[in-house]
């Protein structure tokens, strides 16, 4: 009798294993929010000064989540008026037709590049960051607005990878060119840069800052100043206040995006 029931038992075992494996596959499809995203921003109000009223910044923060598996954050700082046009373009060409997760980064990069084309023609200045599912970044900048990523306490300024390639003279005469790599006033910064990269375990936070931040402090200075501040709102306020204390002449606005 036991031998007669053996085929049935084998079928039941196969069915049970199939259900378990299918359950595992379904669990893998669920999004894992391993990297929480928090943010804060601060703008120094200079409307009372007539000579600075034309240099005010626009700060924009927008979150889009159309499904349980796709969340997009858009952060940015730009010249007044520029930010509105960038966000408007994003809304019309990305947020209303979000692709699936596989094609989202390519779509983000293409849309950001097109959104910045007009600013590139008119000499506008802006910087923005897209955070997709707390796992990937799409970053764009043009002009004097800058994006700096903190990785294990070190500042990484976003630049075009091709433009950042060393010239042959830097290998032959490293001493003579030692200061060139650290020159943050490089004219190449005025060119449009759009890149994508992953958020790794060493990615701590991101600073998006206006010219008023960067004309009075280096990228590493800004990182060192706020790295110990866990609240991104307080970090952004601290950074802006420090720029003001250093008598920055340009507009002062910043966004701090913290991971984990």
Curated annotation (Swiss-Prot):
Domain PPM-type phosphatase stretches: 41-259
Top-level taxon of the source organism: Eukaryota
Alphabetical list of SMART domains matching this protein: PP2Cc (SM00332)
Record CDD domains: PP2Cc
Xref: SUPFAM superfamilies: PP2C-like (SSF81606)
Pfam families xref list: PP2C
Family the UniProt entry places it in: Belongs to the PP2C family.
Name of the protein described by the UniProt record: Putative protein phosphatase 2C-like protein 44
């Amino acid at each position: 009798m036991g031998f007669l029931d053996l085929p049935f038992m084998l079928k039941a075992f196969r069915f049970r294993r199939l259900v378990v494996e299918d359950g595992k596959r379904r669990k893998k499809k669920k999004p894992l929010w391993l990297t929480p995203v928090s943010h804060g921003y601060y703008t120094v109000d200079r409307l009372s000064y007539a000579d600075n009223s034309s240099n005010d910044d626009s700060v924009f923060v927008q979150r889009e989540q159309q499904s349980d598996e796709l969340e997009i954050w858009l952060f940015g700082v730009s010249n007044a008026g520029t930010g509105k046009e960038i966000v408007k373009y994003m809304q019309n060409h990305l947020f209303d037709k979000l692709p699936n997760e596989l094609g989202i980064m390519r779509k983000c990069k293409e849309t950001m590049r097109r959104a910045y084309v007009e600013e590139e023609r008119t000499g506008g200045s802006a910087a923005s960051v897209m955070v997709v599912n707390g796992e990937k970044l799409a970053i764009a900048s043009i002009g004097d607005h800058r994006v700096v990523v903190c990785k294990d306490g070190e500042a990484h300024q976003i630049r075009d990878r091709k433009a950042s390639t060393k010239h042959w003279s830097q290998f032959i005469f490293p001493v003579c060119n030692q200061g060139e790599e650290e020159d943050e006033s490089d004219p190449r910064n005025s060119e449009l840069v759009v890149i994508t990269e992953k958020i790794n375990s060493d990615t701590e936070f991101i600073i998006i800052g206006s010219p008023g931040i960067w004309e009075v402090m280096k990228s590493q200075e800004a990182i060192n100043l706020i790295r110990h501040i866990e609240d991104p709102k307080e970090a952004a306020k601290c950074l802006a206040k420090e720029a003001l204390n250093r008598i920055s002449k340009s507009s002062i606005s910043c966004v701090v995006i913290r991971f984990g």
